Amino acid sequence: TFLVILSIFNWFFEILKWQKLVSTIKKISFFEALEQSLGGLTASLITPNRIGDYGAKAIYFEKQHRKRIVLLNLIGNASQMVITTILGIIGLSIFHWTYDLDLNYRKVFRILIIVIIVASFSVFGLQQSRFKIKGFSIERLIEFIKNLPQKIHTYNFGLSIIRYAIFSFQFYFLLQIFSVEIDYKTAMIIISSMYLLASIVPSLAVFDVLIKTSAAVYLFSYAGVDELTILSISTLMWLLNFILPSIFGSYFVLNFKLPKTED
């Protein structure tokens, strides 16, 4: 069906993105990138914030390459998160003004003050300590990013935008299948807000569907969409884009062989 085709394209572009990132270290085939991407997805399902994806992809490479592979994976995931955050903030802002949310602005102001204070101390702390992300210092991470060719960054962000457009449209297409009366613009505003809210909540990837569903049910309730409909759509999205690919990924995990060392 068309929904499955959209899921295939979603992962096709993710695999292309990974293949391109890895090419800065060594050339790999599309099939190798597919094996690593789906194998990483399978490993990530039972780990917090999909951290298993980093280790799973790294062990496909020789020991001397593994640290850089982790960094490349971090850059690939970060680009997707940046797109989700930017479009999500825009969507959530429009959502707020469209539906006139009943917010306690005094509490919001206090939270913003706390966030600013914490951010200020964090920036100061980063300058005074050896803070690390995924085991790497900020200085090394920045240097690694700077040393990557500009075309790699452009390619990376370009494919991240394409993937975002695909799975967002897939959600909208499911709304149409379930005969939900909602225009494309309104749906995209709510969908982008949903992905933002879901992405900032740490969880096991296997429970990702619960977080997305909760956010979707809450946001779509303002548009008068039935809870059961949103629950069904969110579950289908999860099955198509995570469970189905992870089933194929489990084959690669079960048949995995450590690479020959070059030591």
Predicted feature locations:
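Secondary-structure boundary/capping signal
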Residues: 29, 50-51, 182, 204-205, ...
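Transmembrane alpha-helix interface/packing and boundary motifs in multi-pass membrane proteins
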Residues: 43-45, 193-211
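Predominantly cytoplasmic-facing regulatory/coupling regions of multi-pass membrane proteins
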Residues: 1-37, 94-201, 240-263
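Functional transmembrane helices that embed catalytic/metal-coordinating motifs
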Residues: 40
